[in-house]
Amino acid sequence: MPAILPDIEPLRASREFRLLWLGQFISQSGSALRLVAIPYQIYLLTGSSLAVGLLGLFSAVPLITLSLWGGVIADRVDRRRMLLVTNTCLALTSVALAVSTQLGVASVPVLYLLTAVGSGFSALDQPARSALAPSLVERRLIPAAMALNQSQFQVSQVVGPALAGVLIARFGLAPAYWIDVATFLVATGALLLMRVPRGDVVIVHAAPLRALADGMAFLWSRPLLLATMSVDFFATFFAVSRAVMPYYADRVFAVGPEGLGLLYAAPGAGATVVALTSGWINRAQRRGLGILVSVAIFGLAIALFGLLPPTGFIAGLALLAVAQGADTVSSIFRHTILQLETPDALRGRLSALNLVFVAGGPQLGQVESGVVADLWSPEASVVTGGLACVGVVFVANVLVPQVARYRADLAHGAAVP
């Protein structure tokens, strides 16, 4: 049993990593509340899966345009201080959501606008957060640290949506947003307690455009990194089905807001099981092959979800859990490869480029699934998206066979093709 449990040595060995990890878990639980509340609020206002799907567009545009610059900034300043600024801005965005909802002025355009603003601040926040974490632990502990980060993220994706369903059903939307505000305050407190040694603060002095170009050139020169990011982008673009979950809760399963919360929480439950038994993942040798197999399972589970009848709510929860569990395995492998193969001075920029791929795919995928649902049907959107995800795996294996062959030497950082 201990061989499959997550390795918590990074939490024991580094006080700063422990503080970052705990604060991030609390704030992400609050953010998960918001990510249920906003789509549900828009669905209540419009009854349209397309309107919900357009949230992805308003989230993706600032994320893609600003995250690259967030990576450049993260490699030029103290990353902890940068996180203090972005955390504060994200908290203020949630305050605006709560106040506008309480005052009854949270129209669809207002919700789109605040989604875009929050996404922009997240685009600046996440590269710094991703780049800071591996610098707080020894190189040999990076795989375990990445698995722990996935664990806390996935647990938050269970806690947040499940709590959101209960809160929205019992108290309304505004309390969910206020709890999100409170979690950002806790995360800010954890950052204030951190003491990152000056020797761990990497400062890049190149001109911003040159620094950005250097990051892109490094990624382009590493087909392995580019391929693993691309697989995730296209897989999630086709298979992410968050935009149609309000439809499934309302029209297919007829389970109300509590059921919607469970539909959003089920993926996190599956991912949590994987993350909490991730010891075997840290010791896996064929990480590239693991990515391909995991993404294929993810796509198949989503396609099967789309075929369920109205009586299939419990089966649907199980399939969503399996899908996200598989995606979590892929994500741990991918993030580990990225951090092992990237010099610390480039981690901010590479984390930003990674964010464009791994967050841009799901956000744009919401638009894609909403459009297909509107033109065809929500069920067809889910089934075809899952099958397209499986197709992405086969294409990637043919075009970049070195992904399936990848191994890594944790002691020296040497990749084995």
Each PLM stretch: what is its role?
Residues 1-417:
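Alpha-helical transmembrane-bundle signature of multi-pass membrane transport and export proteins
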